[in-house]
A protein has these predicted regions:
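Hydrophobic membrane-insertion alpha-helices, especially the h-region
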Residues: 33-46
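Long, hydrophobic alpha-helical segments that serve as membrane-spanning/inserting helices
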Residues: 1-28, 46-244
Length: 244
């Protein structure tokens, strides 16, 4: 008679076993949940990136419009300053050619020309938008690299102009003005007062040096103004196609 085999003891149920059975039975559900989670995260990141890009584009438009307006105003002012500076240079050249033997025929015209030569046309740039771009760290929203470089070149050129204009003012006040005030009465009330011996002034070294200083300084500034005008037009040409 055959012996009955002893019954096998059931395997102990562990947490790993339970997990294994759950995975076997419900793996499609788990996979679907993982896919849904990944998809949700991806959509969330994409939406955040879209919102960020849209905000940057809107901010860029605000700055581009501000820059365009500022520089457009600058160019109008530059054209006026260039025109006045050219007139100052022409008048200074005319006065430099006078001599005691061939003076200005009219004293009043002579004084008027001297007064005009010492006009100081100034260029004051509108830089509020550019300053805000730098101070807020928003320069990164300007997507065009060439535009950013051109902006820095333009406002660096403006700083050069300010330095030359400041030096011009100091020279005029300390060197030129004291001499002229001793030799001529430049007030409007004196224009009709006849003077004698004034033509001799045109041959004085101090007078010719004063005119030379004015002419050379204004010629330097004229070059700087014209360069700024060129840079400004280039910037407007870069900005205009990007405006909405």
């Amino acid at each position: 008679m055959a012996k009955k085999s002893a019954p096998t003891e059931p395997k102990p149920v562990t947490s790993l076993t339970i997990l294994y059975h759950l995975l076997r039975e419900k793996w499609p559900e788990y996979v679907l949940e993982v896919i849904v989670i990944i998809f949700s995260i991806t959509i969330s990141f994409a939406l955040d990136e879209w919102k960020d890009n849209r905000h940057k584009q809107e901010l860029e438009q605000i700055y581009l419009k501000g820059l365009y307006s500022d520089i457009e105003t600058d160019l109008g002012q530059l054209k006026e300053v260039i025109d006045e500076t050219q007139q100052v240079i022409q008048t200074a050249t005319h006065l430099s050619g006078l001599t005691p033997q061939a003076p200005e025929t009219n004293y009043n015209q002579f004084v008027s020309n001297v007064r005009f030569v010492f006009k100081r046309p100034r260029f004051i740039a509108e830089d509020a938008t550019f300053s805000d771009l730098k101070s807020t760290g928003n320069m990164q929203v300007i997507s065009n690299v060439l535009l950013k470089k051109s902006l820095f070149d333009y406002y660096k050129q403006y700083e050069t102009i300010v330095q030359v204009e400041t030096a011009e003012l100091e020279t005029t006040n300390t060197v030129v003005a004291p001499y002229l005030l001793k030799r001529l009465s430049l007030g409007a009330a004196s224009m009709n007062v006849p003077k004698s011996g004034w033509s001799m002034m045109t041959g004085e070294v101090e007078f010719q040096n004063a005119l030379l200083i004015r002419r050379t300084t204004r010629e330097e500034l004229l070059h700087d103004y014209q360069h700024s005008l060129k840079l400004g037009n280039q910037i407007l040409a870069l900005i205009k196609p990007k405006l909405n």
